[in-house]
Amino acid sequence: YVLCIWPYHAMLGCAGHAMVPAVFEAAMFHAIARKKQTNFETKGVHPLTENYSVLSPEVKKIKGRVVGQFNTRFFKALMENDRVYIAGQASSHCVKTTIEDLLREIQAVDPSLVDKVYILEDCMSPVAAIVDSDTGAVLVDFPKMAQDALDSFRAAGMHVVKSTDTVDITA
């Protein structure tokens, strides 16, 4: 993939890191209704590595020193559920990389777990394409990368669905 240097965004403690109020309210309602504490997973706590994925940083070692690793605890917690619904931003980067890590671990541990994963394609969007301002040529097509990833996740056995799709609770 093309590595882009991003401006600071979604930094811990700033408004960009906060959940949209409606999503936070839904999480709290779910916690109360199910009598189960919501788990908020933090990522990107090491300043020398990108952490697109919530499961694993881009760089795990710097000069032989471990700066991050795959989050096995969180993976196991996710897989204890009957279904894992995935939504968020952006489908071309953080969500995509998280699902790639999830799929890789599922394939290594128990390929049948792939059937638990439901990707809400209408609850995410890609970073806009990078376009040459002089020629109008698309330099990096992030929307295409996101769509290609969704297609590959579907081919691997994950469910790519819409939030408006009927949920079969008997399955």
Question: What is each stretch, according to the model?
Answer:
Residues Y1-A171:
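Active-site-adjacent betaalpha module
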